[in-house]
Swiss-Prot record:
<keyword id="KW-0732">Signal</keyword>
<comment type="similarity">
    <text>Belongs to the scoloptoxin-21 family.</text>
</comment>
<dbReference type="InterPro" id="IPR034439">
    <property type="entry name" value="DH2-like"/>
</dbReference>
<dbReference type="GO" id="GO:0007589">
    <property type="term" value="P:body fluid secretion"/>
</dbReference>
<dbReference type="GO" id="GO:0008613">
    <property type="term" value="F:diuretic hormone activity"/>
</dbReference>
<dbReference type="GO" id="GO:0090729">
    <property type="term" value="F:toxin activity"/>
</dbReference>
<feature type="signal peptide">
    <location>
        <begin position="1"/>
        <end position="21"/>
    </location>
</feature>
<dbReference type="GO" id="GO:0005615">
    <property type="term" value="C:extracellular space"/>
</dbReference>
<protein>
    <recommendedName>
        <fullName>U-scoloptoxin(21)-Sm1a</fullName>
    </recommendedName>
</protein>
<keyword id="KW-0800">Toxin</keyword>
<feature type="region of interest" description="Disordered">
    <location>
        <begin position="45"/>
        <end position="71"/>
    </location>
</feature>
<keyword id="KW-0964">Secreted</keyword>
<feature type="compositionally biased region" description="Basic and acidic residues">
    <location>
        <begin position="60"/>
        <end position="71"/>
    </location>
</feature>
<dbReference type="GO" id="GO:0001664">
    <property type="term" value="F:G protein-coupled receptor binding"/>
</dbReference>
């Protein structure tokens, strides 16, 4: 019971502070499952094309050589 009251108190503080700062509260409910997948895809594309990012994933050359030897 105390944990529920504490959680409600934290939510209340979040709402009060957001109202004081004139900000909207984002609870993650504005985007559905397909929107989340599309957002992750877009972030991955942006990271792959970013010059300072990790780049795109490439397979190790040893795997490709083994595949070519057996064919």
């Amino acid at each position: 019971m105390k944990s529920v009251i504490f959680a409600l108190f934290l939510v209340y503080l979040l709402i009060v502070r957001a109202a004081e700062a004139n900000e909207n509260i984002g609870l993650g409910l504005d985007r559905g499952s397909s929107g989340t997948i599309a957002a992750k895809q877009q972030m991955g594309i942006e990271l792959a094309n970013d010059p300072n990012g990790p780049g795109r994933r490439r397979r190790a050359p040893a795997e490709n050589e083994d595949f070519l030897k057996h064919s």
